[in-house]
Amino acid sequence: MCETMDFFERYKNLKEKYEEKKTKPKVIVVGRSNVGKSTFVRLMTGRKDIRVGKKPGVTLKINEYDMGEYILVDMPGFGYMAGLPKKVQEKIKDEIVHYIEEHADEIAAAVQIIDTKSFFEIVERWKGRGEIPIDLEMFDFITDLKISPILVANKMDKIKKEEWDAVLDGICEYLKCQPPWHQWKFIVPAILKEGKGIEEIKKKILERVRLFKKLRGIE
């Protein structure tokens, strides 16, 4: 949650723990299926061979891309995936959690992408079943590990422009971050299919990567 996100202190601790380790930082990309992760990775890497589709569950394995200063890690989508048994979906989710836990000390930032249009409906549906909404669970998991988040509120074109602030403030409330959303520098509204928001995301990634490297003594 927002009140516990002391990432600067975490970076200082990592410098001592990894004084001799000179690996590139990782930046992970997480999100439910069909929120725009593959589109984001294509924009970041410039690769045309990354599959993008309307059906959930296009990415089913962990993929790593060397971005020069850091490694971009594209995680499979979690939650509903078309054509996959629930048991397989749970296995994929477990693999995501295991990877993040195992590599937490190497991760400079986590880019979590959400579908802004469906976010509220899905959260309320899960809460109505007495379950923790998966988007909120992932955000809590990331921040509990003291990994610096970048929350990409994608598909903002589905929201009326005059409602953007109210919608983003509402997301803050679900994340237990006091509105207004502008004060939280980790939130980026985006329309990834049009490339909107990508430059701001790149900027935030590099800020976190360079701070991470500086405090760990990595050239």
UniProtKB/Swiss-Prot annotation:
The keyword Metal-binding applies. The lineage of its organism: Archaea, Methanobacteriati, Methanobacteriota, Methanomada group, Methanococci. Residues 23-211 form the EngB-type G domain. Keywords: Cell cycle, Cell division, GTP-binding, Magnesium, Metal-binding, Nucleotide-binding, Septation. Necessary for normal cell division and for the maintenance of normal septation. PROSITE patterns: G_ENGB. Belongs to the TRAFAC class TrmE-Era-EngA-EngB-Septin-like GTPase superfamily. EngB GTPase family. Mg(2+) binds at S38, T59. Disulfide bonds: none annotated. Coiled coil: none annotated. GTP binds at residues 31-38, 57-61, 74-77, 154-157, 189-191. Its cofactor is Mg(2+). This is Probable GTP-binding protein EngB. HAMAP family: GTPase_EngB. NCBIfam families: PRK04213.1. GO terms for molecular function: GTP binding; metal ion binding. Pfam families: MMR_HSR1 (PF01926). It comes from the Archaea. GO terms for biological process: cell division.
